[in-house]
């Protein structure tokens, strides 16, 4: 099945199953070996150093139902500097950059402990970063059907809860061909009546939602009023 682990340290136990980074896929074993569909497959295996794959590590973050994997990116990177997180409860993926070389879940310690390539030890999931942050989430390219028609977006119908509305800003970019120039269609603020007017067209549309004030918020499903247009 070509499910060989990329390194011994990438094998992680999480409850009643284990998971690991294979040479070209992510796998899990709970009595049978399964290939795990991975939305960020290309991010892992296109970025990963061919020479230093053996330095990949994995760790369990049980409080959040997460498995973390660190890996080196680029030909000259000898130690892990990027990570991918699989939430096995929600089956969602996260990515990022972080210098970590090992991970120990909570147990002997109250919090997960991780070390970096310089020998420093960090307590994870402890406290918050200081200073203002701009959290956001961004979609991949959205298309109508097989991408053979242009999409005209006329209206945005958001679903948001915040202490003071509107708490979020939504922005769009688009392309008329996958390899074409990306066009910025600007930002839109969620209106209190639940409708935000817009008018732009593209074959591929990407959406980005950003918090615009320092407050808690929740984001539900965002609906778009989209009409198909011609093929050119």
Predicted regions and their residues:
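Beta-sheet repeat architectures centered on beta-propellers
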Residues: 3-17, 23-232
């Amino acid at each position: 099945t070509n499910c060989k682990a990329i390194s011994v340290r990438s094998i992680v136990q999480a409850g009643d199953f284990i998971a690991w980074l294979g040479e070209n896929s992510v796998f899990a074993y709970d009595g049978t070996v399964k290939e795990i569909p991975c939305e960020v497959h290309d991010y892992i295996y296109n970025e990963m150093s061919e020479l230093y794959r053996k330095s990949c590590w994995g760790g369990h973050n049980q409080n959040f139902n997460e498995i973390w994997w660190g890996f080196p990116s680029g030909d000259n990177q000898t130690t892990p500097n990027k990570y991918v997180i699989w939430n096995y409860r929600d089956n969602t993926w996260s990515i990022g950059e972080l210098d970590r070389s090992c991970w120990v879940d909570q147990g002997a310690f109250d919090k997960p402990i991780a070390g970096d390539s310089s020998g420093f030890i960090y307590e994870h999931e402890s406290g918050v970063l200081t200073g203002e942050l701009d959290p956001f989430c961004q979609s991949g390219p959205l298309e109508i059907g097989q991408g053979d028609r242009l999409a005209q977006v006329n209206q945005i119908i958001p679903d948001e809860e915040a202490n003071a509305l509107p708490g979020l800003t939504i922005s769009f970019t688009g392309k008329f061909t996958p390899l074409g120039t990306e066009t910025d269609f600007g930002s839109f603020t969620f209106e209190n009546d639940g409708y935000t007017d817009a008018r732009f067209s593209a074959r591929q549309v990407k959406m980005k939602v950003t918090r615009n004030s320092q407050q808690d918020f929740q984001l539900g499903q965002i609906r778009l009023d989209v009409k198909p247009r011609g093929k050119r």
